[in-house]
Amino acid sequence: MDTLIWNDLRHHARQWLWSLLVATVGGAIIGVIITAWYSALSWAQAQGSAELINAAHIIGSSLVSYAGLATAVILSTTLGLTVSAQQRSHALWKVLGIPGSRIRRIILAQVGVIGLLGGVMGAVTSLPLVRVYLLTWREFDVFPQNLPIIMPGFGVPLTIAVTMLFCVLGAMGPARRAASVPEMQALREATAPQTRTRWWQWVVVGIMLLGLVMTPFESSLPMSDAERAEMATSGMNLNDPGERAMAGASMGLLAAIAALSVPNWTLRPLLTWWTALIPGRSPAWFAARANARHRASLSMTTIVPFAIAVALTGTVYAAVGAGQATGAQGSVSGFLSVGVPTFFISGVGGIANIAMVGRARRQEGALLGVIGARTRTVLASTALEGVIYAVTGILFGLAATAFSAVYAALYSGGGTAVLVASVPVGLLVLVSGISLALAVATTWLPAQLD
């Protein structure tokens, strides 16, 4: 079994190396979050200030909520894609007589090795990276620029454990499928593995939707004296239009998380819908659209990083714009502290996910050449497939931003003024352009590596 694990890792080295890159970056971000939070908390405790301690906890929890969640999603989806892309090999194992239970153990062991190596390298690289990352904290004006960096004793093992956990969780579904699907069916579906939405994904959606529904009613419920005192201490007042606008706009992020939890019901219909609006007269466009739809389960994973990057930018800045339009003293202070690691893992994840299916894309390009397609058509089809992935993620992010703007306008009662102020057009154009450029460039990268 050990021999098969290592031989298969070498045989599919290109795919596993991309996964290792994502796991290393994810581990580095996890290590940076742990070290930065612990360093800020240690310094605040040394100052003996309850305000500084509270600020450290707020920043740390925000990092976990935004950057940590994005890292978890991208790590798990990337490793799931890696396993799904090797479905043909797993089917051949079953043909050779290897039991399904052993195949599942082998796959999870391989993913565990990648998570372990990524966690170790991420923990090591997080130490020099945390000093660079803390430059984004200067906008807080709370902690010193030369904040002492302290990695706790549990930092390295926790980084490794969390990285491995996210990797293994993402691979459990594809590994279970590889062990249970009949080998002939798996061989037929090797280029386009089928996926299904599981019960726990709907549980996540239900929790997120409950938050969306309950938010408008919370401010109308009577509060006790203790609750009023706590809100006054924190500076929050949900009866203030500015606070209501910012709270309403932040609901877009909950909606985005809920939608990304069930990509088969959100991203797949979105991809099918908007690509159907463009006529398929061009052979390059027709081939790119057909490939993206045919590999829908793999395409969903590729779209997720771009969707996260655009949705995070849109919803956060929508909350700030809505608050400022209603008189709240909000700013984007602290956005870089969560935005930089999120954009970093999103970019690396997007590049890796597109590159990992490059072999299948090149095989399809070769088939197009056999039936008479020109080289220019094949290359255009490859680039257009990257465009489809990026545009689908961009449209998802724009939809999340629009949801935030509408929710803020309705919840605050600010109307059109809040709606217009909630849409950060310039930043959305910038992030969308970067996502599009990355996707198009990465579709060419695997061909250059051959």
Regions found by a protein language model. Give the residues of each.
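Membrane-anchoring hydrophobic segments
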Residues: 46-190, 194-196
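Loop-to-helix entry region at the N-terminal start of transmembrane alpha-helices
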Residues: 52-71, 155, 249-255, 325-347, ...
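Selective transmembrane-helix segments that form parts of the transport pathway or gating/packing helices
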Residues: 16-20, 71, 107-127, 164, ...
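Interfacial "coupling" helices/loops that link adjacent transmembrane helices in transporter permeases
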Residues: 4, 15-17, 73-114, 348-387
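C-terminal structured domain segments across diverse proteins
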Residues: 323-440, 444-447
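Alpha-helical transmembrane segments, especially those used as permease/efflux helices
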Residues: 2, 6-36, 55, 68-71, ...
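Small-residue-rich transmembrane alpha-helices
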Residues: 28-39, 79, 112-141, 156-180, ...
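Short juxtamembrane loops and helix-capping segments at transmembrane helix boundaries
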Residues: 40-56, 130-154, 225-242, 327-333, ...
